[in-house]
């Protein structure tokens, strides 16, 4: 007796799936096979040892980047719109917040759509020059974001630690800082175009970044020096600023408690004390934002150092996570500032009432204000 099997849609799908599995295990195929010939000169020989990635990973990455890009562009776009159209939010310090949102917005505008398309095609499809521009954009906007956050930390330090003795920031001062941030970032970004390292496809072949697999130590030195000025130095400066911010607030709170004991009262809740409490809360919010940024970029830094030091193998799948975490930082900032800034919330709900889920009129809610706003309300004697 013979048994015949109807080759219906289910059986055809099973055969297709089996052929894909066989392809992934076929040593004759590599992750580079889908790359166009004009891109091959940018790809390191190291990646030829890896088989093609499962299309599921490309689909998952493309979907995730698409969602993150939409959230980031909407969130940062709202931050820019609200801060620039609300009179009591147009302060010198808040210009730094707008610059941060602007940098994050441009990052996702430049990188998210391209990566979604590449993930759909399972390889880079825009050619070598676009690959270089893509890597350039990631470097430029990433550097601008972290140094903007560093300037925000210095602004907090100047007001909270130095108090009324601090020289208040002016609009010209804020604009000068922003101009310096972009000039500094651009200088680091264009260096690979002049021979100090280069921008090449990542191992997943859907994104581009610096060449951390090069054997040339002159090119490797770019990654080392870049990480010093764009990762480690800002990190130390931010830690320094917030260390003294926490110290100043802690000393103030201790003095307030001692004074309350002398006056035989439960606490002293003057306007100044309330403002200090607000500044303390905002310092925590800003510190959380910066911590999230470093959490986002650290995986990519680790991948770069692993490559130049050849300390461990790097798989194409690992480069996916580096790209994903790096781009996710553009989503954090509008969420954190939107939650923590009641004047931003009030302006947002006034323009978009549908976004208001509940009333935030309690004293506790209103006390969690942005340090940038508090700074501008303090006397500048």
Swiss-Prot record:
Q: Name one GO molecular function term.
A: photoreceptor activity
The record's subcellular location field reads: Membrane
Q: Which family does it belong to?
A: Belongs to the G-protein coupled receptor 1 family. Opsin subfamily.
**What keywords does the record list, in alphabetical order?**
Chromophore, Disulfide bond, G-protein coupled receptor, Glycoprotein, Membrane, Photoreceptor protein, Receptor, Retinal protein, Sensory transduction, Transducer, Transmembrane, Transmembrane helix, Vision
Q: Which InterPro entries match?
A: GPCR_opsins, GPCR_Rhodpsn, GPCR_Rhodpsn_7TM, Opsin, Opsin_lateye, Retinal_BS
Q: Indicate yes or no for the key word Cell cycle.
A: no
Provide the protein name.
Ceropsin
> A GO BP term, please?
phototransduction
Q: In which tissues is it expressed?
A: Expressed bilaterally in dorsal and ventral anterior protocerebral cells and bilaterally in the dorsal posterior protocerebral and lateral posterior tritocerebral cells (at protein level). Expressed in the larval brain but not in the subesophageal ganglion or thoracic ganglion.
The species this protein was found in: Bombyx mori (Silk moth)
Which regions span the lipid bilayer? 63-83, 97-117, 134-154, 174-194, 222-242, 285-305, 317-339
**Residue positions the entry lists as glycosylated:** 28, 121, 204
A Pfam family annotated for this chain is 7tm_1
Cytoplasmic-side positions: 84-96, 155-173, 243-284, 340-381
Q: Which PROSITE patterns match?
A: G_PROTEIN_RECEP_F1_1 (PS00237), G_PROTEIN_RECEP_F1_2 (PS50262), OPSIN (PS00238)
Give the membrane topology. Multi-pass membrane protein
Q: Which SUPFAM superfamilies did the record assign?
A: Family A G protein-coupled receptor-like
- In this UniProt entry, which cysteines form S-S bonds? 131-208
């Amino acid at each position: 007796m013979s048994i015949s099997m109807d080759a219906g849609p289910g059986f055809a799908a099973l055969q297709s799936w089996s052929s894909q599995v066989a392809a992934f295990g076929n040593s004759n195929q590599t992750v580079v096979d889908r790359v166009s010939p004009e891109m091959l000169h940018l790809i390191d020989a190291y990646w030829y040892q890896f088989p093609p990635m499962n299309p599921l990973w490309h689909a998952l990455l493309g979907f995730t980047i698409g969602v993150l890009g939409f959230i980031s562009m909407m969130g940062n776009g709202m931050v820019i719109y609200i801060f620039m159209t609300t009179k009591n939010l147009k302060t010198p310090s808040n210009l730094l917040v707008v610059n941060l949102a602007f940098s994050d917005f441009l990052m996702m505008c430049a990188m998210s759509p391209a990566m979604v398309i590449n993930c759909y095609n399972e390889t880079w499809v825009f050619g070598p020059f676009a690959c270089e521009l893509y890597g350039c954009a990631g470097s430029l906007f990433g550097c601008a974001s972290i140094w903007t956050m560093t300037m925000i930390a210095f602004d907090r330090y100047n007001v909270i630690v130095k108090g009324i003795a601090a020289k208040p920031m002016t609009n010209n001062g804020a604009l000068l800082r922003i101009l310096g941030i972009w000039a500094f970032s651009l200088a680091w970004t264009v260096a690979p175009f002049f021979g100090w390292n280069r921008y090449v496809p990542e191992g997943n072949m859907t994104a581009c970044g610096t060449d951390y697999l090069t054997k040339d130590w002159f090119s490797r030195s770019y990654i080392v020096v870049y990480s010093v000025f764009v990762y480690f130095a800002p990190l130390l400066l931010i830690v320094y600023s917030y260390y003294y911010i926490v110290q100043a607030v802690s000393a103030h709170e201790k003095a307030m408690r001692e004074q309350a004991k002398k006056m035989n009262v439960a606490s002293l809740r003057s306007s100044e004390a309330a403002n200090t409490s607000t500044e303390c809360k905002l310092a925590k919010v800003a510190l959380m934002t910066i911590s999230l940024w470093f959490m986002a970029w650290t995986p990519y830094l680790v991948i770069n150092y692993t490559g130049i030091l050849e300390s461990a193998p790097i798989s194409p799948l690992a480069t996916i996570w580096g790209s994903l975490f790096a781009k996710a930082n553009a989503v954090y900032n509008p969420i954190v500032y939107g939650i923590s800034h009641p004047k931003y919330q009030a302006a947002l709900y006034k323009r978009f009432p549908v976004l208001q889920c509940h009333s935030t009129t309690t004293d506790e809610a209103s006390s969690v204000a942005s340090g940038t706003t508090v700074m501008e309300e303090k006397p500048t004697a």
